Structures are given as C-alpha cells and as structure tokens.
From Swiss-Prot:
Originating gene: plsY
Name by which UniProt lists this protein: Glycerol-3-phosphate acyltransferase
InterPro entries: G3P_acylTferase_PlsY
Keywords: Cell membrane, Lipid biosynthesis, Lipid metabolism, Membrane, Phospholipid biosynthesis, Phospholipid metabolism, Transferase, Transmembrane, Transmembrane helix
Parts of the chain that traverse the membrane: 5-25, 50-70, 74-94, 115-135, 151-171
Length: 209
C-alpha cells in the first residue's frame, strides 16, 4: 500500500505539472504564452492570447489532469482506504509548481475543478454553476474562480465533509494566493473583463458617458 500511495502521488504531481497552455502555445502556435497577456500559462490567458480553440483544449486537458490524478484510487480499488482528494491535491501542486516549467505554473483553478469532478460530480456541477453566475455578474474570470472554490469550501463545512473541507480550504488558499495581483486590480477597478456580463456592461456604460 505504501508504494502504491507514493506512486499515485508521483503520477498526480507529474500529471498536474503538464504545462498545457505553454506547450500548445510553443509547439502548435509557436508563441511563448508566458510573454503574452498576463504571462500565466493557464486557461484564461490561453483564451485571450491564443484564441477560443486553444483555450477550450487547455481547459479540457487541465480539468482532465485533476480528474485522472484523483481517480487513481478508484482505478486501483482502494478509494475506501486512500481518499482521492488527497491524491488529487498533488495534481494541483504540480499545476502551480511544475517541474516542466522551472517550478512555475498556473493558478490551479481548472485542475482543482477536475479533482472535484472525480470525487463528486454533483459538486462539480454546483461549482460550475456558481462560476458561471459570478462570471455573468462581474465579467471577471478571476472573481468567478475565487468565489467558486470558496463556495465549495463553505459547502464542505456545512455538510461536514471534513476531508473535502481541508482540501478545498488548502486549494482556496492557493487560488487566492495565485490571484493576489488580480485582487489588487479588482480593488482598484482595473481587472480585465470578458466581453459580456453585467460588470462589462456597467464599465462600458461608464466609459462611454
């Protein structure tokens, strides 16, 4: 069992470490995404700098990384002994501190969502709905991401799912830390917005006065 756990942790970290946006940008679009837009290698910056198709692919793969990592205990039939969330946590670690990107990485949002998908698909749907609602309200991917992960942490506390609460709490801290520059921009009214939603409408209306 010990070696199985170590093996799952290593695989989870390596899966999470795959810098999807960086590699797609470099090998398909011949662009270094780290030098474009926000410089982040995650989904949002991929959408903004490489386009819709690339963004969708990166989103799918980054979610899949978390799902596959957290599904390992199910594959091995030991999910009753080894909690999938604890294994999946190492995928988010890999995503933010990637061995393939000089220990830099993304903001862990999509990969964390993938972990939740493997563990509890219903909560994954809830998180997605919250994300979409906040995105339509604020027009800010960063705000939607932080609210979405925070909501899962609060829900886990409410339903007494303690391991989920611990993992979601850790990931909430990671997501907020990785979004610290976004938080400063939100507070100063300078955060980037998607071109739809109430926040975008109000900003455009204000600027066009």
């Amino acid at each position: 069992m010990f070696f199985e756990i170590i093996g799952m942790i290593i695989i989870a970290y390596l899966l999470g470490s795959i810098p999807t946006g960086l590699w797609i940008g470099k090998y398909i679009y011949h662009k270094d995404i780290r030098k474009l837009g926000s410089g982040n290698i995650g989904t949002t910056n991929t959408f903004r700098t490489l386009g819709f198709k690339a963004g969708v692919v990166v989103l799918f793969i980054d979610i899949l990384k978390g799902t596959l990592a957290a599904s390992q205990p199910y594959f091995l039939g030991i999910s009753g002994t080894v909690n999938p969330l604890l294994i999946g946590l190492f995928a988010s670690l890999g995503h933010t501190v990637s061995i393939f990107d000089n220990f830099h990485g993304g903001k862990a949002v999509a990969t964390s969502a993938g972990i939740l998908l493997a563990y509890n698909p219903l909560l994954f749907v809830v998180a997605c709905l919250i994300f979409i609602f906040v995105l339509c309200l604020t027009s800010m991917v960063s705000a939607a991401s932080m609210v979405g992960i925070s909501a899962i942490f609060i829900i886990a506390l409410f339903i007494h799912a303690w391991i989920l609460a611990i993992v979601a709490g850790i990931l909430t801290g990671v997501v907020f830390y990785r979004h610290r520059s976004n938080i400063h921009r939100i507070l100063s009214g300078k955060e980037s917005m998607v071109s739809f939603g109430l926040g975008y409408y109000l900003r455009e209306k204000k600027q066009n006065k």
